[in-house]
């Protein structure tokens, strides 16, 4: 690994070995002093949209990839309509198969008949790997979101027209251990834009 570039080595079976650098870097580099948000899971520059989040016992899950050592210091969301709610956000590591695994860090962000961007302290260092974001709200809300065209296509049912962009589970809170079953796929839907300020 060289500053986020992944060296891929392949053997073609005849004794010849090929090496190449994967130029995909996540999070992307920025200039010194840039404290704008990195949105985990946003794959290309685009205009953000909105998503309606069902409150209560529903948790939303979606993966993101880190290709270089990254330290998060702040987490943020943006409610686009006034609401009274507490939003819980968690980062989970993954199993060898890439499934959501253990909760690494979580934070709560509260709103009282208000909207807009709010932040919470979120001190977490991540090594290169696959991680999962989980988000739930105590009440129904509308949040700034990643449009479908800029989301990760996790799977595509029946090779149809809409790819899975996130999953849903029924939980009363963010669990310490991600569920091993009970996920429902959402296809062709925006994903909440969770912003991170990096150290």
Regions of interest found by a model, annotated:
Residues 129-131:
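A short tyrosine-centered beta-strand micro-motif
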Residues 136-199:
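Short, surface-exposed beta-strand/loop patches at domain edges
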């Amino acid at each position: 690994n060289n500053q986020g570039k992944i060296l891929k080595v392949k053997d073609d079976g005849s004794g010849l070995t090929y090496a190449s650098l994967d130029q995909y870097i996540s999070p992307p580099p920025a200039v010194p002093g840039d404290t704008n948000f990195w949105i985990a899971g946003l794959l290309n520059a685009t205009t953000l949209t909105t998503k309606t989040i069902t409150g209560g016992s529903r948790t939303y899950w979606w993966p993101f990839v880190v290709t270089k050592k990254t330290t998060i210091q702040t987490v943020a969301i943006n409610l686009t309509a006034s609401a009274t709610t507490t939003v819980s956000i968690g980062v989970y590591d993954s199993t060898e198969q890439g499934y959501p695994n253990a909760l690494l860090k979580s934070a709560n962000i509260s709103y009282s008949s208000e909207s807009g961007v709010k932040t919470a302290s979120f001190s977490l260092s991540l090594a290169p790997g696959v991680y999962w974001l989980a988000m739930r709200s105590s009440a129904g809300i509308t949040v700034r979101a990643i449009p479908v065209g800029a989301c990760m296509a996790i799977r595509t049912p029946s090779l149809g027209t809409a790819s899975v962009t996130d999953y849903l589970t029924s939980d009363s809170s963010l669990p310490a251990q991600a569920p091993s079953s009970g996920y429902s796929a959402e296809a062709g839907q925006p994903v909440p834009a969770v912003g991170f300020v990096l150290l």
